[in-house]
């Protein structure tokens, strides 16, 4: 019987040059798996806790405490367990930690080991990670939610909304869809350069021009779609990540759009979204309101929920109990899936199953601080998420996921690509 023989971690760097945890699990048959944990910039209040050292190293962002927890507390309890019982491995770490948000061990320590265990198990069986996690049912290639213009916390410009994305919804396969958005990205660079604006990129590879309003990036993207020879609405759709929790004034409870020098109530912001959706082929809005503004989310869902995918990121933080509450109250209709928000592979899978049972779409997602680790590419296919959010075709930490998806698609051969289908039920 194969068992976990050794576990260790070390401190490596993410795409922003900040330290993060790399965990390695070695099995008794000699196979091993490693995983690098991502980190977010715009984070929800109820996310699992990322353990940082808080000393002088790396401006306080070192992760040696988390590394030590892997090498001692976690390793001591997991060595001898079966790597093929992911639920037991993850539950054991949760028991060791003893808190609801992994504040003792650190979610970055726990997730690294959880992911590395899954990878080691797949390697031991000599099957791809997506096949190990998803079985024979893993057959859906995700539609990319492709970051093309950055604002908010992800860029140093005057645009308030955090991400403007395009989605290749009018194509029959992943490869053609990826080609289309990659070509549009190159044309957008030319459009922005012609405008005399910077073509510097943000954390996730999208451009970060200093535009005049929150609507202007959409019109600029529409121009790039046309110049690339594609049809907006028919082949290419638009998605927004507002990250509204970063915009709200906690005292006035109004949303501050600094780039436009105005403040809006929840209802006014919903009307603003409705106006944008009437002008442009917007199919998805993420975190359109603050994570605490559930009354506002109710207004948003009632007004746009039948027409647009309304995604909860900070709202749900990949937490099954919070998603269940949202389902009960009729809030949003989709869940962004970030494994490091909840802490383990098993808990992430639980949240996805709950969402899918209740007809909520799932979008597998990276974080703004990433690495060469492409675990989420396999994870998205394994659980038939149907959508993935993993940046643009710039920065190798984002490209790693797309290249892995191309590899997976070639291996599967018969893979499905849902295109517009995730949005047709809205």
Curated annotation (Swiss-Prot):
Main location, first listed in the record: cytoplasm
Keywords recorded for this protein, A-Z: Cytoplasm, Glycolysis, Lyase, Magnesium, Metal-binding, Secreted
Positions annotated to bind Mg(2+): 241, 286, 313
Cofactor: Mg(2+)
Gene Ontology CC terms: cell surface; extracellular region; phosphopyruvate hydratase complex
InterPro entries: Enolase, Enolase-like_C_sf, Enolase-like_N, Enolase_C, Enolase_CS, Enolase_N
Cellular localization per UniProt: Cytoplasm; Secreted; Cell surface
Sequence positions that bind (2R)-2-phosphoglycerate: 162, 338, 367-368, 389
An example molecular function term from Gene Ontology annotations: phosphopyruvate hydratase activity
Cofactor note: Binds a second Mg(2+) ion via substrate during catalysis.
Pathway assigned to this chain's UniProt record: Carbohydrate degradation; glycolysis; pyruvate from D-glyceraldehyde 3-phosphate: step 4/5
Active site positions: 204 (proton donor), 338 (proton acceptor)
Enzyme class: lyase
UniProt superkingdom: Bacteria
Reaction equations catalysed: (2R)-2-phosphoglycerate = phosphoenolpyruvate + H2O
This enzyme's EC code(s): 4.2.1.11
Single GO biological process annotation from the record: glycolytic process
Family: Belongs to the enolase family.
Biological function: Catalyzes the reversible conversion of 2-phosphoglycerate (2-PG) into phosphoenolpyruvate (PEP). It is essential for the degradation of carbohydrates via glycolysis.
Protein name listed in UniProt: Enolase
Annotated gene: eno
């Amino acid at each position: 019987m194969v068992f976990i023989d050794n576990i260790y971690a070390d401190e490596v760097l993410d795409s922003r040059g900040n330290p993060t945890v790399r965990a390695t699990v070695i099995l008794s048959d000699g196979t091993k798996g490693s995983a690098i944990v991502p980190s977010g910039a715009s984070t929800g209040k109820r996310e699992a806790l990322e353990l940082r050292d808080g000393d002088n190293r790396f401006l306080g962002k070192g992760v040696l405490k988390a590394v030590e927890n892997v090498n001692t507390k976690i390793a001591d309890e997991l060595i001898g367990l079966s790597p093929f019982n992911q639920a037991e491995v993850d539950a054991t770490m949760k028991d060791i930690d003893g808190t609801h948000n992994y504040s003792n061990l650190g979610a970055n320590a726990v997730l690294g080991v959880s992911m590395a265990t899954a990878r080691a198990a797949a390697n031991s069986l000599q099957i791809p990670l997506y096949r190990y996690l998803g079985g024979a049912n893993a057959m859906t290639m995700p539609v990319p939610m492709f970051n093309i213009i950055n604002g908010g916390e992800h860029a140093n410009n005057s645009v308030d909304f955090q991400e403007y994305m395009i989605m290749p919804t009018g194509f029959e396969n992943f490869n053609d869809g990826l080609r289309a958005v990659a070509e549009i990205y190159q044309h957008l660079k030319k459009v922005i350069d012609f405008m005399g604006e910077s073509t510097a990129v943000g954390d996730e590879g999208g451009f970060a021009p200093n535009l005049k309003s929150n609507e202007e990036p959409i019109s600029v993207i529409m121009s790039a779609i046309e110049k690339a020879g594609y049809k907006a609405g028919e082949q290419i759709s638009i998605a927004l990540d507002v990250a509204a929790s970063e915009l709200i004034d906690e005292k006035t409870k109004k949303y501050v759009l600094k780039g436009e020098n105005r403040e809006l109530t929840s209802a006014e912001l919903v009307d603003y979204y409705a106006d944008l959706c009437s002008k442009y082929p917007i199919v998805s809005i993420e975190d359109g309101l603050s994570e605490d503004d559930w009354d506002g989310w109710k207004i948003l869902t009632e007004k746009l929920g039948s027409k647009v995918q309304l995604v909860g990121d900070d709202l749900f933080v990949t937490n099954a109990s919070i998603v269940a509450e949202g389902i009960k109250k009729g809030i949003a209709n989709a869940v962004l899936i970030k494994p490091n928000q909840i802490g383990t592979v098993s808990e992430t899978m639980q949240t996805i199953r709950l969402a899918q049972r209740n007809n909520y779409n799932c979008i597998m997602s990276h974080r703004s601080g990433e690495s060469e680790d492409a675990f989420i590419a396999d994870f998205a296919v394994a659980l038939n998420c149907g959508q993935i959010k993993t940046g643009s075709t710039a920065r190798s930490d984002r490209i790693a996921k797309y290249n892995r998806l191309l590899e997976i698609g070639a291996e599967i051969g018969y893979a499905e690509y849902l295109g517009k289908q995730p949005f047709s039920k809205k």
